[in-house]
């Protein structure tokens, strides 16, 4: 993705986010976005296949982006709701292992290279929305737009991107050699058009 398109994507989604957050509510103790909640219906195959990702669609010829995403999801997102309760630990650990190896094998050498890597491999558009120093560390508000795992999934009332959470932890832990905590706070699957991760890097 070219720098100009990357910036357009960030600007577009930041404007959208402001409205979505102003319309959010709390359901069962979780933040839920404005899209209609479909909590009692299972996520089925038609929800998983052929999603539209406006900025990545422009970046790939011949309608290949939806096929790329579908292939990933059929392998990784076979049962998002059932795995949400029982398999999230496995997904986080798998993501952490991948994130660690991406750094160890030289695919990502610095914090500034993370966004370019995720965009190149069509995993998502990373926006470092906020960064602040806290006692004994640093806090990051990371947002991912057009996420390969959840973009255009229905609102099931809870975040599901455990694998991506693990990737973030693995990359940052290996880059900083510090304790890293991350939690997905908002997600396509909880009614938004983005994923938000609260990240703490402890000194």
Name each region found by the language model.
Residues 161-177:
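Active-site helix/loop of acyl-thioester processing domains in fatty-acid/polyketide metabolism
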Residues 1-160, 181, 186-196, 201-203:
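N-terminal accessory segment detector
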